[in-house]
């Protein structure tokens, strides 16, 4: 009998299941091919995405691993985890593919704190996207680091994904993100209700149409909302609400949201890289479809959701009730192929 390691990430036997892409998304998601960095030998290391994960505290070390490693499995080149010193050694043992920085030190050690802030800020200049929240915790010092991170990243116009306890910070201080459109929030039901209350939005008992998520996007000044649930809803001010209803897994184990944040993060990096490539082209390619920035953010959120759900379904099909989030990691590549199956570059 084969026993899988708790952090097993290698490929599993191929599972033949039907593709998951849904007709309502096809016209939008066909454009996603244009956003994916080409694997044609023209790119250098890092040009397919440099991702930063801010989180990882003494009590929570798995979450940033899941987020960072998922981003690599989808196709980003480099994944940096920025965490508390006591968490760094543990996270390093999970995978040699992650670069782990113990910058989130205590202000009780002023010299080290100032040095780490400086090193962290220099690292931000090299990243395409920052995922804030996995394993962050609600400790005052970690929340202070998250606040500094958001303010600094916004000044640098970094693309952002906010999850978990970064959303707790946003509930307390919604003005931190207000008016900044280059961000995706990924709240679950409880986190979503807290955000509504923080923005003085009256909740409704039933909201399958995503209108509340749209109101939240408007209240925060145009960021994207990926509202997780039995059906994932993606809303952004000025765009139509997208619904992701493809089959996932009935097993709800810890870590799936962290995997989602890493996958969305990679798509956000690809969004940034796509528009950088477009600005460098002397004239647009005649065969390419036009993509607006608003569409690109919707694509990033929808595809992150679709791939996570498909990956979860594949893992559950193999492992059943015993499935853990670590089992999902080896299926990310196959899930990507299934989600994109049926689309053409023509």
UniProtKB/Swiss-Prot annotation:
<feature type="binding site">
    <location>
        <begin position="248"/>
        <end position="257"/>
    </location>
    <ligand>
        <name>ATP</name>
    </ligand>
</feature>
<dbReference type="GO" id="GO:0005737">
    <property type="term" value="C:cytoplasm"/>
</dbReference>
<feature type="region of interest" description="Disordered">
    <location>
        <begin position="1"/>
        <end position="20"/>
    </location>
</feature>
<protein>
    <recommendedName>
        <fullName>ATP-dependent (S)-NAD(P)H-hydrate dehydratase 2</fullName>
        <ecNumber>4.2.1.93</ecNumber>
    </recommendedName>
</protein>
<dbReference type="InterPro" id="IPR000631">
    <property type="entry name" value="CARKD"/>
</dbReference>
<keyword id="KW-0520">NAD</keyword>
<feature type="binding site">
    <location>
        <begin position="188"/>
        <end position="194"/>
    </location>
    <ligand>
        <name>(6S)-NADPHX</name>
    </ligand>
</feature>
<dbReference type="InterPro" id="IPR029056">
    <property type="entry name" value="Ribokinase-like"/>
</dbReference>
<feature type="binding site">
    <location>
        <begin position="228"/>
        <end position="232"/>
    </location>
    <ligand>
        <name>ATP</name>
    </ligand>
</feature>
<dbReference type="GO" id="GO:0005524">
    <property type="term" value="F:ATP binding"/>
</dbReference>
<dbReference type="GO" id="GO:0110051">
    <property type="term" value="P:metabolite repair"/>
</dbReference>
<keyword id="KW-0456">Lyase</keyword>
<dbReference type="GO" id="GO:0047453">
    <property type="term" value="F:ATP-dependent NAD(P)H-hydrate dehydratase activity"/>
</dbReference>
<feature type="binding site">
    <location>
        <position position="258"/>
    </location>
    <ligand>
        <name>(6S)-NADPHX</name>
    </ligand>
</feature>
<keyword id="KW-0521">NADP</keyword>
<comment type="similarity">
    <text>Belongs to the NnrD/CARKD family.</text>
</comment>
<comment type="function">
    <text>Catalyzes the dehydration of the S-form of NAD(P)HX at the expense of ATP, which is converted to ADP. Together with NAD(P)HX epimerase, which catalyzes the epimerization of the S- and R-forms, the enzyme allows the repair of both epimers of NAD(P)HX, a damaged form of NAD(P)H that is a result of enzymatic or heat-dependent hydration.</text>
</comment>
<keyword id="KW-0597">Phosphoprotein</keyword>
<dbReference type="GO" id="GO:0046496">
    <property type="term" value="P:nicotinamide nucleotide metabolic process"/>
</dbReference>
<feature type="binding site">
    <location>
        <position position="135"/>
    </location>
    <ligand>
        <name>(6S)-NADPHX</name>
    </ligand>
</feature>
<dbReference type="Pfam" id="PF01256">
    <property type="entry name" value="Carb_kinase"/>
</dbReference>
<keyword id="KW-0067">ATP-binding</keyword>
<keyword id="KW-0547">Nucleotide-binding</keyword>
<keyword id="KW-0963">Cytoplasm</keyword>
<feature type="domain" description="YjeF C-terminal">
    <location>
        <begin position="28"/>
        <end position="339"/>
    </location>
</feature>
């Amino acid at each position: 009998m084969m026993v899988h390691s708790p952090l097993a990430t290698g490929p599993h036997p191929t599972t033949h299941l039907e593709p998951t892409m849904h007709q309502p998304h096809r016209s939008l998601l066909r454009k996603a091919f244009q956003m994916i960095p080409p694997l044609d030998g023209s790119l250098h290391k890092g040009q397919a995405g440099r991702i930063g994960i801010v989180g990882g505290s003494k009590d929570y070390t798995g979450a940033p691993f899941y987020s960072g490693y998922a981003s690599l499995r989808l196709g980003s080149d480099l994944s940096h985890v920025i965490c508390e010193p006591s968490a760094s050694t543990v996270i390093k043992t999970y995978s040699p593919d992650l670069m782990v920085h113990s910058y989130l030190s205590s202000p009780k050690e002023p010299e080290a704190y100032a040095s780490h802030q400086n090193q962290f800020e220099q690292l931000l200049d090299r990243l395409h996207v920052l995922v804030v929240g996995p394993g962050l915790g609600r400790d005052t010092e970690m929340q202070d680091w998250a606040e500094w991170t958001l303010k600094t990243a916004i000044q640098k116009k970094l693309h952002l994904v906010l999850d978990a306890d970064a959303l707790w910070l946003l509930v307390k201080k919604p003005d931190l993100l207000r008016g900044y459109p280059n961000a995706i929030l990924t709240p679950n039901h409880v986190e979503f209700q807290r955000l509504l209350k923080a923005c003085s939005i009256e909740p409704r008992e039933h909201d399958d149409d995503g209108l509340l998520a749209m109101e939240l996007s408007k209240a925060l000044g145009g960021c994207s909302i990926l509202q997780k649930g039995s059906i994932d809803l993606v809303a952004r001010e000025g765009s139509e609400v997208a619904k992701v209803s493809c089959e996932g897994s009935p097993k709800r184990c810890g870590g799936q949201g962290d995997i989602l944040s890493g996958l969305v993060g990679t798509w956000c990096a690809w969004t940034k890289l796509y528009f950088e490539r477009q600005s460098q082209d002397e004239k647009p390619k005649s065969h390419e479809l036009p993509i607006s920035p608003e569409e690109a953010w919707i694509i990033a959120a929808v595809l992150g959701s679709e791939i996570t759900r498909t990956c979860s379904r594949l893992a559950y099909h193999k492992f059943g009730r015993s499935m853990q989030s670590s089992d999902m990691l080896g299926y990310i590549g196959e899930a990507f192929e299934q989600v994109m199956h049926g689309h053409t570059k023509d």
